[in-house]
């Protein structure tokens, strides 16, 4: 199992409509995405993949959020990693 966490702070609360279009909740066999709101301008998107190969093919959400950052509409940070097995 592999995961990606996309944290963001929006320039304005009105940008939530854009984020909802980008990061709406999805549940598929090998992929799950959840959008969380932590404040008027902040939130995070969690993506869970079956493995790193699936993560490499599912980059649309990450690219769209990075696009908001490049346009100075949001501050975005991204972390990825594998589940630690006991």
Task: Report each predicted region and the residues it spans.
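Short S/T/G/P-rich N-terminal loop/turn motif that feeds into the first structured element of a domain
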Residues: 1-64, 71-86
């Amino acid at each position: 199992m592999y995961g990606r966490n996309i944290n963001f702070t929006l320039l304005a609360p009105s940008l939530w409509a854009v984020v909802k279009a980008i990061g709406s909740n999805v549940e598929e066999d090998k992929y799950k995405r959840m959008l969380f709101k932590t404040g008027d301008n902040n939130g995070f998107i969690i993506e869970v993949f079956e493995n790193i190969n699936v993560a490499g093919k599912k980059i649309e959400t990450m690219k769209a959020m990075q696009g908001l950052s490049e346009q100075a509409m949001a501050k975005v940070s991204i972390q990825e990693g594998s589940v630690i097995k006991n």
